[in-house]
Every structure is written in C-alpha cells, then in structure tokens.
C-alpha cells in the first residue's frame, strides 16, 4: 500500500482540527430577556439598585451556554447613582469567590472559531458589571457567582469617598417553591395556645418542652432539639440565607429524612441544607415554629 506524503498528512490534520472549531457564538440583547422584568429594587440615600437572577434556561437562551451546569449563576444588577460622588461596588460582597467575566469566557472557548471566541470574550467583558458608577449615571451588568438552589440571597456593598452602604437581596427564582411556603404559619396555633414570656421565662418553658421530635405516630422518639431561634420570620430567613443555608424545595428528595420527624403533629416547617467545607456531605437544619413568643418575636425549635 503506497504511503501518503507527510505534507498531505499535515494538510489533512489541519483540516480536521479546523473543522472541529465550527461553533458560532451570538448572544441575545439583555434587554430582550424576560428576567429583567423580575427585578427586586432597593434604594438608600440616592443609590438605587435593581437585582434579578436569570434561570438556567434563560441563560442558555441568552448566551447558548449552560453556565448553571458548571455551577455558575449570573446575578444581574442595575445601579443608579443619584449622588454627587462616584459610587464603587464591591463585587466580592456579592460572592467572595465570584468568577470574572473573562474567566467565564475562557472556560467556554473550546470548539469555537477564532472570531467566535473573540465575540464571546467581548460580550462577557462588556456585559459585566462595572465597579465604578459616575455621579448622575446608571450602569448595569452581570456578576458571576456560585450557584445555589432556591432563593438567591446576597449582599451588595457600595462605597463613596465619605460613606458606605449595605444592601441585602433575596431574589426568588421561578419554578422553585421552598417547603416553608406550604405552611400557614398564622393558623398553626390558636390564640389561647400562644405563650408570651421574657428570656428567663423562655428558659423555664424550654425546660418543660419535649426534648425531641417524634415519629408520625407520636410514639418513637427522634432527634433532640438542640438549637433555638428567637426572631421574626423575615429576620430568621435573612440570617440563614446570609449564612449560606440553602432552602429545600417542597416535596423534594433532599427533605425526605427531615419529613420523618414531627413536632406538634407536623413535619418541619422548613428544612435547610449546607455543604460541609470539604464537600463530603450536607448538614441539615430542621425548624419548627413553637407556640412561644418573646415580646413580638416567635421562638423556633430546631435540629442541626
């Protein structure tokens, strides 16, 4: 069998390699995306921030890239600076291990033609959130954070030369319903069941409260209540999400074990999960609203 000349082999290889890089990148205009209609807005002393989070499907529709599959969750922010000074946004306050736009683009360069790689890098660079907002102007863009299930909770720290501002956002995502949304908290206890106490009285009542959860039949003893929260529902949720506890979706497999534990004849009012630092397993936090109040703040019993 005659041998192919080396020059021909090189040509064939070059054609094969160039033929693999045929993907084309073309992103949609952000203003045409549906997620911008779901913004959550906050304002402090002349700084207005609008925040929203696109779903995995919306990211694919906009960019053709499945960022969620790689654990990347874009957060879109619009900053209106109505002050007389520059405003600086601390991107690390949103996620202290956020991905830079060019880092994201670099991770998806494989398989694209040279001009498409350049277009991708340009789009990610231009659509990233600028750090500095001139006085009287508005800027918008993405910050690429680590993906978490459920409500997206994050801070946005803003600075001028003379002041600092902290914004805390909780942005719900379509299609995710946390388990605690199924609970009618106002109907859990009758008015005559509510016990209002001060802190010394709380210690006394807790000493008399069941030590542990029960099974559905109220016969077998479950895990002990080893955590107590005194907080309004909003304050408790904020504290948990800021501490990186993740909500559990209603009826999900993740909450199956938690639903075997009962207090006052019901499963946990809310179950939250948190990954251990080494990623080996998840910690679980089960929470029930108790009939005890300290002032206007409800008391919650929990297992961790």
Locate the predicted segments by residue.
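Terminal, regulation- and interaction-focused segments at domain boundaries
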Residues: 209-239
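C-terminal motif of bacterial Sec signal peptides marking the signal peptidase cleavage site
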Residues: 17-19
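Short, hydrophobic/aromatic beta-strand segments
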Residues: 85-93, 154-156, 237-242
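The feature marks short-to-medium sequence segments in extracytoplasmic or secretory-pathway proteins
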Residues: 82-134
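Surface-exposed edge beta-strand/loop patches
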Residues: 21-28, 126-193
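A cross-kingdom signal targeting lumenal/periplasmic-facing segments of multi-pass membrane
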Residues: 73, 80, 251-304
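Short, solvent-exposed beta-strand/turn "edge" segments of beta-rich domains on protein surfaces
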Residues: 59-76, 82-86, 132-134, 217-218
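Low-complexity, acidic Ser/Thr/Pro/Gly-rich terminal tails and inter-domain linkers that flank the onset
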Residues: 28-69, 186, 206
